[in-house]
Amino acid sequence: MAPTTPATHDPALSHGAPPTQGSQAPANAAPNLTPADISGMQLNGLDQSQIMNLLRSLPGMFTGAKIPDQGQGNPKEDAAQTLSNLAQASSPFGGQHLPIHYQTGAAGGLPGINDPGPSTHPRGPPNLGQLSAVAMQAAPATIQHQDQQQSGRQEDGEQAGNTSIDSPSAKDGENGTGEFNQTSTSTPSGGRRGGRSATMGSDEWSRQRKDNHKEVERRRRGNINEGINELGRIVPSGSGEKAKGAILSRAVQYIHHLKENEARNIEKWTLEKLLMDQAMGDLQAQLEEIKRLWEEERMARTRLEAELEVLRNMNGVSTAGAGSGAAKDESAAGTKRRSTDGADAAGTNVEGGNNDNAEGERDGKRQRTE
């Protein structure tokens, strides 16, 4: 049965041939490599001459090893020998392990499926515990850099907050435009401070609480001042006072006055409505009575017209006969009246002649007497 792979071993590197006891050797000890093994290494696609140039450019790294000059001997064997000497030499950094970096490219990256296993790896499998330790050492540096950036932003926010707090506030009796401007000015700094999370109970947390309380109080005062100024513009002012207390007092008096007027108007409107309803009821009763009388008169007239028509039909002939008899009587009476008038006129003439004769005789007798 094959031995199991240890927990610190990379599974991607163990693909291929089964691991051996030699592959589990600690990474601290430099393996005994031959020049042939080192000559088969591929460092990121570099040839042997480039490797030698890189090794020569490193200062203070090869005090105990001799590097052949360029152009002497076989470059391939020289590079392999130099790498073998470096592997066997002690570390110049006091035994501190250097992290192994792999290039994430097509050439020289992490070993794939078709790459050789740990048994043929030139320096043995990488120690994952060592890589984790290196990562943990690099993490505090990143955290420290972030803390420095946060402290810089915090100082900027505190300066902006102090600037907004130190600005002069508006007086209590005047309009609240100054406080409203302070609120709008200090809002961005408060938003930046609120975006950071501080530890509960720390100085930064207490400072944030105080700043938030000041911001809320400033907004509340601004709203109160704005409302009082609006009341001062609405409520009629006899003396023209602009103090907040005077404005509130006048507003209360004006509200009481409006409520009293409303009560009086409601009472008056109710009485007028009752009187109007009563008058409308009386007019409706009179209208109904007039309609009834008119209907009775119309029916009586229709009845009388019908009776008159019946009487005319019944007395039509008798009326015509009575009319002809009356005409005859009138003609006879007229003839008799004319004859009587002629006789009377003749008698009157005779009497007049007789009288004239008598007077003439009396005159003659008087003349003879004289």
UniProtKB/Swiss-Prot annotation:
InterPro entries: bHLH_dom (IPR011598), bHLHzip_scCBP1-like (IPR047206), HLH_DNA-bd_sf (IPR036638). Residues 143-152 have a biased composition (Polar residues). Keywords: DNA-binding, Nucleus, Transcription, Transcription regulation. SUPFAM superfamilies: HLH, helix-loop-helix DNA-binding domain (SSF47459). Residues 183-202 have a biased composition (Low complexity). Residues 208-258 form the bHLH domain. CDD domains: bHLHzip_scCBP1 (cd11398). GO terms for molecular function: DNA binding; DNA-binding transcription factor activity; protein dimerization activity. One of its GO terms (cellular component) is nucleus. Residues 1-39, 102-221, 317-370 are annotated as: Disordered. Residues 204-218, 359-370 have a biased composition (Basic and acidic residues). It is found in: Nucleus. Residues 208-221 are annotated as: Basic motif. It comes from the Eukaryota. Residues 222-258 are annotated as: Helix-loop-helix motif. Transcription factor that may regulate the expression of the gene cluster that mediates the biosynthesis of psilocybin, a psychotropic tryptamine-derived natural product. This is Psilocybin cluster transcription regulator. It comes from Psilocybe cyanescens.
